[in-house]
Amino acid sequence: MTESHRELRGARKDGKVTLKTIADYLDLTPGTVSAVLNNSRASQAIPEHTKNRVLEAARKLNYRPNYFARSLRGKRTHTIGVIAEEIGDPYGAMVISGIEQHLRENNFFFLTVCHRHDQKLLQTYSEMLQSRGVEGFITVDTSVLAAPALPTVAVAGHQDVPGVTNIVLDHRLAATMALKHLYELGHREIAFLRGQPFSSDSADRWAGICHVAQELGLRIRPELQVQMDEMDSTPQLGYKFAKIVLARKIPFTALFSYNDITAIGAIGAVRDAGLRVPEDVSVIGFDDIPAAAFASPGLTTVRQPLLRMGQIAARTVIDQIEQRAPFVPKIAIEPELVVRQSTSVAATPHLHAQPAWPARKIPLSPA
């Protein structure tokens, strides 16, 4: 009897197709079918035409593997727990996209939870994910304060915790790139929209800015800085706090915002104040989210490779789980300055003109 007319012997009463169903259908052993479908080492000794028969039968019979049962047998779930501060903002979305891409390519799954700045949820979610059998954790823009029970990689965690690998941007180098760019364009009075205090990147990024400003001889005026302290991840946040700085009527020729999404909002506030970008006020952001290139004008920004950071995090946690590589406490990521149309030479007559400053060579790497 041909396979196209053979009855499904060994089929379960619920109609679900199992390895035994396929084995009986092809007059093969379940072990042979399993080896082919799992592409195990044993399959290397199986003739090619037999492999093709198994794969064709699996497609024809609509076979769906039971990953949960497989994980119980092998004591593996191939599942990672991802704990993020936000998943709807461009930063978190791009990092998680990189995580997903690498995990998918390596036959891992992931469960994602979002704590929205509620520290009490971190422990709850950690325990919940462990109860569901995750083999490791990746945190995104979340401070890990205690040693984890499972392999853990933190993207922008900024905490030195034993057993946790931190993937961090070189914020001092990033600040050097941004401020040196503005300095060389003649900007001396620069306004700053500082990041929210609950964001794990905020303190390191601001410390880098202050250090580099001192190296350049730039004065950071208290009245030209404001800390954004609301739980918002839209351009409206940047618009609101840029309006606060503008209302102080202190002249400035450039504005450096904590991230791109708030920089885009700040551009709107500057324009609503009757000023032009970049002719009157240059604006620079941080991250290089996809929208930065399509803002009007195109946003100059410091790029941190968020997609690649997610991929590196996924690769690192898998390496730790499968003990492929030795533990490393920190992986440093280099930023890149992306110059677009939102920055230009400081030459606006309505603001206090700055005297020409002697050009100085400022190294891109911190001393």
Task: Kindly give the residue locations of the regions a language model identified.
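Hinge/beta->alpha junction and helix N-cap segments in small-molecule ligand-binding domains
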Residues: 85-94, 113-121, 167-177, 193-243, ...
